[in-house]
């Protein structure tokens, strides 16, 4: 989450990185290449024609090795296509806008194509009760900033994925609480 403050400190705009992260690009490349490699190995064992550069799968028996390689290759290719689509659609990406001049807060995220492709949440700054920091350590750590509203709703403001560093999380939460002039909870 990156923060840019502009217009005389009356507007805070935070970009949220969605699925267009380096790790997602790397996993999409690896899974797609592996899936296509397995699929070509299975097809090569059936046709007895080498379709790969790095190996000779024509020596494999089609039953059962070739069929298994084709099946896993098909699954890997489909999963690779899914990963590429999530990167192209930038799932989870968006921004948080906090505007003191108009008294409005807008949280925007991108979703899957269709009726709910754009997820928008709007509220007034007067409806904000506090900013909450949620820190859970352990095997599956969670570090998130929430916008707590007076009607008891908690709206997540941080991205999903790799947890933020503690110092960065605390600084961003403190800056946001100071900007909105609300208390900071959870520290």
Swiss-Prot record:
Membrane association type: Multi-pass membrane protein
GO biological process: photosynthesis
Compartments it resides in: Cellular thylakoid membrane
Gene name for this UniProt entry: ycf4
Transmembrane annotation, as ranges: 25-45, 69-89
Record function comment: Seems to be required for the assembly of the photosystem I complex.
UniProt keywords, alphabetically: Membrane, Photosynthesis, Thylakoid, Transmembrane, Transmembrane helix
Family: Belongs to the Ycf4 family.
Annotated protein name in UniProt: Photosystem I assembly protein Ycf4
Taxonomic source organism: Trichodesmium erythraeum (strain IMS101)
GO terms for cellular component: photosystem I; plasma membrane-derived thylakoid membrane
InterPro entries documented for this protein: PSI_Ycf4_assembly (IPR003359)
Higher taxonomy: Bacteria, Bacillati, Cyanobacteriota, Cyanophyceae, Oscillatoriophycideae
Membrane in keyword set: yes
């Amino acid at each position: 989450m990156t923060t840019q403050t502009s217009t005389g400190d009356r507007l805070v705009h935070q970009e949220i990185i969605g699925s267009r992260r380096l790790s997602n690009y790397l996993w999409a490349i690896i899974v797609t290449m592996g899936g296509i490699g397995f699929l070509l190995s299975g097809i090569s064992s059936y046709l007895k024609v080498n379709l790969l550069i790095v190996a000779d799968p024509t020596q494999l028996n089609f039953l059962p090795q070739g069929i298994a390689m084709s099946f896993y290759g098909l699954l890997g290719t489909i999963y690779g296509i899914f990963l590429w689509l999530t990167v192209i659609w930038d799932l989870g990406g968006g921004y948080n806008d906090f505007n003191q001049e108009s008294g409005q807060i807008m949280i925007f995220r991108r979703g899957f194509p269709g009726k709910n492709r754009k997820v928008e949440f709007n509220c007034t700054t007067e409806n904000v009760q506090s900013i909450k920091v949620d820190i859970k350590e352990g095997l599956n750590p969670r570090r998130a900033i929430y916008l707590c509203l007076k009607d008891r709703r908690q709206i997540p403001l941080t991205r999903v994925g790799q947890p933020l560093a503690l110092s960065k999380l605390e600084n961003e939460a403190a800056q946001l609480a100071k900007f909105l002039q609300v208390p900071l909870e959870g520290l």
